[in-house]
Amino acid sequence: MSRAFTRESDTPEALPERAPGAHPNYVTPAGLAQLRARSAALRQELAAAQARADAAAVQALARDLRWLDARVADAIVIDGTTQPRDRVAFDAEVEVEDACGAVRHWRIVGEDEADAGSGSVSWISPLARALAGARVGDEVLWPRPAGAQPLTVLAIRYPDARTPR
């Protein structure tokens, strides 16, 4: 019998699960709050998709919600107020100067919080790894595809010493 006359399943093809993170899920307190807010928003989207009987959307949203809930459950909150003040660690805001004299500010955060456009980089990024443990005045090499870039650490700040976010 030809497939032309057989009924296709109304159930969408199963989506593969989203892969869990390969590294510990370190987050700032604000990062955990963001994950929880995203989870709550996703639950609302899922309820709306269920109400309109959108099977494909329900499947995708349920998968994403399982992944997000696992990220929340696995979160390891690092309180920046307890970090060492004299060297770069998780939740530090670091002021650096490159070889051309340009000054940039980077904040080291969890994978789910990272947004290079706003100056937040993941703790597992090459930049954060290069800065980890550095002190004011230290020069580090930031490995980049275009070649390593030397950076001088000008300042290190942590949450209790920053202006309000």
Task: Give names to the regions the model predicted.
Residues 111, 153-165:
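Short, compositionally biased
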